Amino acid sequence: MKRPNVAILGATGAVGAEFITLIEERNFPYENLKLLASARSAGTELTVNGKTYIVEEAKPESFDNIDIALFAGGSISKTLAPEAAKRGAIVIDNSSAFRMDPEVPLVVPEVNPEDILKHKGIIANPNCSTIIMSLGLKPLHDLSPIKRVVVSTYQAVSGAGKEGIEELENQVKQYTAGEEMTANLLPTGSAPKHYPVAFNLLPQIDVFLENDYTKEEMKMVYETQKILHDETIQVVPTTVRVPVYRSHSESVLVETAEPVSVEAFKAACEKFPGLQVKDNPAEQIYPMPLYTSNQNDCEIGRIRKDLYNDNGMNFWIVGDQVRKGAALNALQIAEYLVEKQAF
């Protein structure tokens, strides 16, 4: 089997570090590996599978002779992804730059793997919240087409990067010392006001748009429709930042075309790849972010019918947004390309 030459862009960041961990854990096959980052991080030494690599500054020519390029995200994708694709690399991009481009497949491998090979050089990784929700939606959608989704997210501070974790830690220290909590980052760096996230909930992730939904919320709308190949699905999201380090949680109410029993949905979830059913109210068994952190599978529980609508189904789903919500999803796409020898 041919093994690809692989580049990781953003190797020194949180998602880049997760790429490296997962490549080692999953024995991802590669011929040569190149680690890339900004000029500021170039020169850093990183070890992968026992071999030390020096991180290079990312430039267009960095992608010469690269088969698969894993982009950890960020604004640099917009300029470097087309350059890498032009040089023959298949780019798997974790940024939002190309997600809604009709020429670019938006892929969750358990949900729409058939879209991977339709790429024209770039494949987009969806938003972390969309990926996690889609793993709960797909088994239900296969039983009866989804008409409407109402979702509230409980998103960990690490979704805002390591600065989000540091801000939460500092605020907890300030609060316990009786000091005023300082906030410089959340709900979003570009906002005119910032609020403490410690002992608090922030019902804003990213900037507000003209319709009073946030950019994060509208990502969930459009991306869900694209992944499930149905623009008629109504998605009504509220995204909330919570004082949790890692793993996003989501409360989801779905209306399907026909009624689906709890038993049928649970059975479908149990067979669905990447999903673990943790659902036993009598034993207080349900998914929690503390226990899904650093694991590959998402967990689904609190599965129950809508009290008033026979076509309605409620569930609670939790997943590690750095793993399945970012690095793992991208690496699974790369694994698919290797399996099909399509690079």
Where are these regions (language model features)?
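N-terminal Rossmann-like NAD(P) cofactor-binding subdomain of oxidoreductases
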Residues: 1-192, 232-234, 267, 284, ...
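General structural feature for long, well-ordered alpha-helical segments within catalytic domains
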Residues: 11, 19, 136, 197, ...
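Helix-loop-beta segment of a Rossmann-like dinucleotide-binding subdomain
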Residues: 117-124, 200-211, 315-317
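A glycine-rich, Thr/Ser-enriched phosphate-binding loop motif common to dinucleotide/cofactor-binding enzymes
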Residues: 123-132, 212-221, 325-329
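Short acidic/glycine-rich loop or secondary-structure boundary segments that cap or lie
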Residues: 159-162, 209-212, 244-247, 262-263
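Oxyanion-binding "anion nests"
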Residues: 192-244
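C-terminal active-site/capping subdomain that shapes the small-molecule cofactor and substrate pocket
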Residues: 232-343
